[in-house]
Amino acid sequence: DPQLHILWNEQLQEIHAQMMGQVQIEVLTQLIKERFGVVVVFGQGNIVYKETIAKPVEGVGHFEPLRHYAEVHLLLEPGEPGSGIEVASACSEDVLDLNWQRLIATHIMEREHPGVLTGSALTDVKITILSGRAHIKHTEGGDFRQATYRAIRQGLKSTESVLLEPVYAFTLEVPQEMVGRAMTDLKQRAGKFDSPEFGSGNGMDYAVLQGTVPVATMQDYSSEVHAYTRGLGHLTLELSGYDVCHNSEEVIAETGYDSEADTVNPTGSVFCAHGAGFIVPWDQVDNYMHLPRQFVPEEETQTPADGRSYETVSYTHLTLPTI
């Protein structure tokens, strides 16, 4: 069945089946039982959200418990939709040895970094190494991992984050007299679509709607289409990446994620005084950091083609060699 897709979700550590309604669920349940003797139950499923940023920001991470040392400054910028995480460097080797820069780049790319809205994975962000510092005696490899993670988190806390949700590209074909019902349904589901196209065939006048719609709003809609068109309608859905979440406030409230309470992914830094380390909250790091900030934004408000709103920054002093 070309409409059936089986996926392994690394984030949730689950097997996901993308199916088109209750009928397909019943058929697959029966097939698994007949072939493997296993009775399976399909749950409602979960929506995998992601997060990005709306404005550029410099994030600072410092890790200095006793006999450890690393400080990292990173520039986080909004990336192109679907670009994931990109890494570059604008840091001179005179400031930080290239081996340390490569280690920072490795730590940026070695994991999915949680956002600060819902703890969902960060995506579509370009991260540039601006500066950093090591200690000739006390720095170990793990110190830069801690400083890098904290720099990303501090940057996210210091700027505006955007919640993203998965969307379908859809094609909906219905009898022409039912196109009004279809358009109303899609609008209620936060769908975006062009004007309908009309045609005829197989003794029926039909209308075709095409566009995008959030995955979260389309649960069991194929069954609904089948019901109200008496089997004459046809809905095709195909995953089409991520877009700004249509109900961000509701999702954030339901998730109940508290970035300040996430001890596994701290937003603050660790400094040392009088032979003991102490934690500095993310919004006070500027008062303790050992290196000056490198990034001074020249803000120019614009609305990009994808509809996301953020501020761009002009900076001519940065060079971006490949690490």
Which stretches of residues belong to each language-model region?
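Accessory interaction regions appended to the cores of large information-processing enzymes
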Residues: 1-318
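A short, hydrophobic C-terminal helix/tail in secreted or cell-surface proteins
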Residues: 319-323
